């Protein structure tokens, strides 16, 4: 069961002027499920993205990078689930481009104005006949208020759709943002089997939009982990249609800061939804490391704790075996760390003080916190002013079962 994750309600998801979303049941891997999504984007919109750092990146990621760099103006996105089109060689690359060609032909745009995305099983070729047959019905039911159905159509091992909206006032105009995400396993973005899409009706210059998507990714999708694996297909895309009339043409000033905060907070909500729905997750842990020399070492330590199977299983068992956290801090790779200055809290419970057990710590207090569904682990390094936060989940028996049964 997801951790404190209510189902999104269609009425709470706001249309974004200039964006229409349509889905189809193409039977790419399983019958009778939404598995193709087409997103139509108004002419004149700007689009920016960040993608997986996995060197074995999937064919659609390569095509996305090419088409974004082409500067023709993106007019459509196409996403399929059930097949990652990764590890598929030249045939997979040709299939990704053929998908763009087919959608472009039906929409009357150029092929390099389409961004393709895939998620699912690696090392299998796309069933192109089924995928291409799904494009026309997806286009036919494209509507501005299809955000919930869109979220459903990009799910793989997710147990529920992930979608959210925001509005923000910029220069006296109401700016709307809506987004969807998917992912439940192989999540340690940089990115990881994670897709995220946010659209806004602000008018944003392309370089500014790229700065926005990069900042939002660093503070959201690149700050979560479920199992430490980095996928071949991760993508996070930001669309700005300009339909609200609120214009942002430089990466500073109050208007930029307001939109950056809105985009980042929405991305954080979508990213945390992924962790809350992590495969087999029963708890959400916030790992906050402070007092570091720089953000990089804080994040390095936070990820060491978040990735530790011993830490994650202790949280699953509600077992306050908290020396495991200190051990992870110690092997994180910060060679000049003075462990005698390290302090550790679970929520408001001070567990370790100056590198050792806090004399006032009682295990029953740690046990009380460990039984909660949401827990904050705070680690103070005592060597600077930098900080970083990572979100993760526990590791349960169900994680093994879900992944063992994934292809069956």
Swiss-Prot record:
Protein keywords: Acyltransferase, Amino-acid biosynthesis, Arginine biosynthesis, Autocatalytic cleavage, Cytoplasm, Multifunctional enzyme, Transferase
Top-level taxon of origin: Bacteria
Catalytic residues of the enzyme: 193
Pathway(s) of this molecule: Amino-acid biosynthesis; L-arginine biosynthesis; L-ornithine and N-acetyl-L-glutamate from L-glutamate and N(2)-acetyl-L-ornithine (cyclic): step 1/1; Amino-acid biosynthesis; L-arginine biosynthesis; N(2)-acetyl-L-ornithine from L-glutamate: step 1/4
GO CC field: cytoplasm
Swiss-Prot/TrEMBL site (Involved in the stabilization of negative charge on the oxyanion by the formation of the oxyanion hole) positions: 119-120
GO annotation, biological process: L-arginine biosynthetic process; ornithine biosynthetic process
Protein name: Arginine biosynthesis bifunctional protein ArgJ
InterPro entries: Arg_biosynth_ArgJ, ArgJ-like_dom_sf, ArgJ_beta_C
SUPFAM superfamilies attached to this UniProt entry: DmpA/ArgJ-like (SSF56266)
Natural source organism: Cupriavidus pinatubonensis (strain JMP 134 / LMG 1197)
Subcellular location: Cytoplasm
Residues at the site labelled Cleavage: 192-193
